[in-house]
Amino acid sequence: MKPNVQQVKTFLMQLQDDICQKLSAVDGGEFHEDSWQREAGGGGRSRVLRNGGVFEQAGVNFSHVHGDAMPASATAHRPELAGRSFEAMGVSLVVHPQSPFVPTSHANVRFFIAEKPGADPVWWFGGGFDLTPYYGFEEDAVHWHRTARDICQPFGEEVYPKYKKWCDDYFYLKHRDEQRGIGGLFFDDLNAPDFDTAFNFMQAVGQGYTDAYLPIVERRRNTDYGVREREFQLYRRGRYVEFNLVWDRGTLFGLQTGGRTESILMSMPPLVRWEYSFEPKEGSPEAALAEFIKVRDWI
């Protein structure tokens, strides 16, 4: 049975609407939409909320691109895809809050299909969500991972541990030997047991992101902070930039397929700083972050 591509696209566009609506309700600000077309085929809707009451920048992007040949980043680990036409669609978002006590969050759900005449289509879903705190709170991490586990539960006991580990492995800065944050879920190449089940799981992850994130935002948004906390937040945002530009497959795929650069780099924090050989003061809350983001079972 050929996957229902239109059904997936309809869901993704609705998901973008829903997430923007919920983030706006929390922030009080509005998203500004930029619709764009891709010369080689496809296009998308980029929505950005800037300098809001809670979020310094929140970007929620929908894209649907297609082409006659696969880019190198996609065929590197799937050589059988070379020479096929493809369609890729997804919703990708990153939220950078004003307050250092509210973590940055990222979520993504996507669908990919590659076809050639006389052969069965090759398709899969991917996605997940992950959390990057600047100051660690155990109850937030537990809530985040408990929500992730509850999303996975109906699809099998083994699903959460498998995709949690994949997330921990993926969001790792090899050159720093540290995690990007406390993880969450990450899955890719999902095409089993059948289209409907895989699609249902992708929907559950996409819809579950706000359940995981917004209670944490509400809990931390009014915590007082000063220059020290803000400086540390900007310094740690540097790790986000490093990961996205050096290790992230999605960024590479977007740039190699001639995607819209502004939308691809929408995940970048609006302000960031680096400091040579920075060492937080021993025993400080800033120093505690290194231990907090180490891989562990939160629930």
From Swiss-Prot:
Catalyses which reaction(s): coproporphyrinogen III + O2 + 2 H(+) = protoporphyrinogen IX + 2 CO2 + 2 H2O
InterPro entries cross-referenced by the UniProt entry: Coprogen_oxidase_aer, Coprogen_oxidase_aer_sf, Coprogen_oxidase_CS
Gene3D superfamilies tied to this protein: Coproporphyrinogen III oxidase, aerobic (3.40.1500.10)
The protein's enzyme class: oxidoreductase
Cofactor(s) recorded in Swiss-Prot or TrEMBL: a divalent metal cation
Cellular component aspect of the GO annotation: cytoplasm
Keyword Cytoplasm applies: yes
HAMAP family tied to this protein: Coprogen_oxidas
Self-association state and partner proteins as the record states: Homodimer.
Protein name per its UniProtKB record: Oxygen-dependent coproporphyrinogen-III oxidase
Species name: Enterobacter sp. (strain 638)
Lineage: Bacteria, Pseudomonadati, Pseudomonadota, Gammaproteobacteria, Enterobacterales
